[in-house]
Amino acid sequence: MSKQKKSEIINRFRKRFDTKMTELGFTYQNIDLYQQAFSHSSFINDFNMNRLDHNERLEFLGDAVLELTVSRYLFDKHPNLPEGNLTKMRATIVCEPSLVIFANKIGLNEMILLGKGEEKTGGRTRPSLISDVFEAFIGALYLDQGLDIVWKFAEKVIFPHVEQNELLGVVDFKTQFQEYVHQQNKGDVTYNLIKEEGPAHHRLFTSEVILQGEAIAEGKGKTKKESEQRAAESAYKQLKQIK
């Protein structure tokens, strides 16, 4: 694609992002950080941009910032809950389905910068991709304005869902399966990535879940995390004989 086309797409993104931040009641300093947060690797590949200009590094950072923010929120809100309960609650809040809820609620999915092929194959509605962008956005917000602003964003976008019990239907199967195995004294659970296939912008991961040294289920997903969730879901339903 041409440089002119790239410039048009980026300028359109920047205008939409500026409008979105105004709607949310936030300002920003470094627009380049947010552009990177919304740049999927397929977009970078289509325009032959620097391979590190996609959002994966910011996603890595945002994941940690999000866990810290949610941990502090739960620690303050539930002073009498033990560590195990807090961990379970945090897992529900920061799991992929929850992040998709947060992102879609404020329309972040509409602004993702995708390559032509990824757009055609439904990348804009893919849960793993949306949740990754949400984490990358949190990473960019942290670098641009600090933890206090991340906290204010969470107060507006994340915590209300928690307080209104809107995440009760979200299932973190890895946590559920781990707890079930522990209750049944069935040993340790581990996950192995057994296959990774497809082009860089459209990867498919296959993971297996190991219990007592035996592979008992497999799962596929667009990310390693998603494939492990699907494997855990299959194993959990298999052991509990849920259809």
Swiss-Prot record:
Its EC number is 3.1.26.3. One of its GO terms (cellular component) is cytoplasm. Residues 219-231 have a biased composition (Basic and acidic residues). Mg(2+) binds at residues 59, 132, 135. InterPro entries: dsRBD_dom, RNase_III, RNase_III_dom, RNase_III_sf. One of its GO terms (biological process) is mRNA processing. Digests double-stranded RNA. Involved in the processing of primary rRNA transcript to yield the immediate precursors to the large and small rRNAs (23S and 16S). Processes some mRNAs, and tRNAs when they are encoded in the rRNA operon. Processes pre-crRNA and tracrRNA of type II CRISPR loci if present in the organism. HAMAP family: RNase_III. SUPFAM superfamilies: dsRNA-binding domain-like (SSF54768), RNase III domain-like (SSF69065). Keywords: Cytoplasm, Endonuclease, Hydrolase, Magnesium, Metal-binding, mRNA processing, Nuclease, RNA-binding, rRNA processing, rRNA-binding, tRNA processing. It comes from Staphylococcus aureus (strain bovine RF122 / ET3-1). CDD domains: DSRM_RNAse_III_family, RIBOc. Residues 172-241 form the DRBM domain. This is Ribonuclease 3. Residues 219-243 are annotated as: Disordered. The active site is at 63, 135. One of its GO terms (molecular function) is double-stranded RNA binding. Belongs to the ribonuclease III family. Residues 10-146 form the RNase III domain.
